[in-house]
């Protein structure tokens, strides 16, 4: 959602994406840490997938609300969502130049800066969580610590792992697109962030036990890098899998962006 008319608006928009992603990871991975790390009171709780699904849904709502309060239209908090809007917007600009009010160069500058902000926000949030929960991290095996940072597949299979993340991201983006189309029918009166909250909650319930449902490159790669850089004994960031939660969501956003721009 790019509501930028000139470069003077970029800093506030980028700052909103940074803070939105920061609070997304702080809330989402914070909840995951409560459920996974040793000596946490919630470690032995039941229905962990359900708890994680609702926690991440609320984390998305928090991130979107905070970002949008700083800059109306911000709140992508996901490089794949930002790329979808950039791809579809660029093609729409080429096909229908009279109906789009932003320049293509500004759009792609905004995209690159948004990505930097989203990854930086995710990494800073994870670094803060590691500081807060370090005593628990020290008493937890490194593979369990890894899943408090990023996603890991239950069974490593490149084609199926990639397809799972691709499909889940496609559902997310399509849901946001369809929800936005109801604006003329006053659907937009619901608080911004409610639709992605519900969609993410449902996606984690549907796909989370297989791949963890990253559907967001910043959410996965940013904290994974923090894990890699942290002084955790016998750590393994699972780099052979790390490209899938990045490439699959971005591939879905490009393909959907092209289809939407050309067909819709």
Curated annotation (Swiss-Prot):
Family designation: Belongs to the MIP/aquaporin (TC 1.A.8) family.
Identify the InterPro entries for this entry.
Aquaporin-like, MIP, MIP/Aquaporin, MIP_CS
Would the keyword Transmembrane be found if you checked this record's keyword annotation? Answer: yes
**What is the name of the protein in this document?**
Probable glycerol uptake facilitator protein
Per UniProt, the short sequence motif NPA 1 occupies residue numbers 78-80
Recorded hits in SUPFAM superfamilies, A to Z, give:
Aquaporin-like (SSF81338)
Q: What is the lineage of its organism?
A: Bacteria, Bacillati, Mycoplasmatota, Mycoplasmoidales, Mycoplasmoidaceae
Pfam families (alphabetical)? MIP
| Any one GO molecular function term | glycerol channel activity
Q: Where is the protein found, in the record's own terms? A: Cell membrane
Alphabetically sorted, this entry's keywords are: Cell membrane, Membrane, Repeat, Transmembrane, Transmembrane helix, Transport
The entry's free-text remark on domains says: Aquaporins contain two tandem repeats each containing three membrane-spanning domains and a pore-forming loop with the signature motif Asn-Pro-Ala (NPA).
What's its catalytic activity? glycerol(in) = glycerol(out)
The cross-references to PROSITE patterns, in alphabetical order and at most eight, read: MIP (PS00221)
Q: Where is this motif: NPA 2?
A: 216-218
Membrane topology term reads:
Multi-pass membrane protein
Mark the transmembrane ranges: 13-33, 51-71, 104-124, 162-182, 195-215, 244-264
Q: What is its main location?
A: membrane
GO CC, sorted alphabetically, is: plasma membrane
* Function of the protein: Mediates glycerol diffusion across the cytoplasmic membrane via a pore-type mechanism.
What gene does the UniProt entry assign to this protein?
A: glpF
């Amino acid at each position: 959602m790019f509501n930028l008319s000139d470069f003077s608006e970029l800093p506030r928009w980028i700052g909103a994406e940074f803070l939105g992603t920061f609070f997304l990871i702080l809330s989402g991975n914070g909840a995951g840490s409560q459920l996974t790390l040793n000596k946490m009171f919630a470690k032995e709780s039941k229905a962990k997938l359900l708890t994680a699904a609702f926690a991440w849904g609320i984390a998305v709502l928090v991130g979107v609300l905070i970002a949008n309060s700083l800059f109306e239209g911000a709140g992508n908090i996901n490089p794949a969502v930002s790329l979808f809007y950039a791809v579809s917007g660029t093609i729409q600009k080429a096909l229908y130049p009279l109906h789009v009010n932003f320049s293509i160069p500004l759009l792609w500058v905004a995209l690159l800066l948004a990505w930097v902000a989203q990854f930086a926000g995710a990494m800073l949030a994870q670094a803060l969580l590691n500081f807060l929960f370090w005593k628990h991290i020290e008493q937890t095996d490194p593979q369990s610590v890894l899943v408090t940072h990023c996603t890991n597949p239950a069974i490593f299979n490149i084609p199926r792992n990639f397809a799972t993340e691709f499909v889940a991201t496609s559902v997310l983006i399509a849901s946001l697109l369809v929800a936005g189309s109801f604006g003329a029918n006053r659907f937009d009166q619901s608080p911004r962030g409610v639709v992605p909250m519900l969609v993410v909650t449902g996606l984690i319930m549907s796909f989370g036990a297989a791949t963890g449902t990253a559907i967001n490159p910043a959410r996965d790669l940013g904290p994974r890098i923090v894990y890699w850089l942290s002084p955790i004994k016998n750590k393994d960031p699972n780099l052979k899998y790390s490209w899938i939660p990045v490439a699959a969501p971005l591939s879905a956003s490009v393909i959907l962006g092209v289809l939407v721009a050309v067909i819709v």
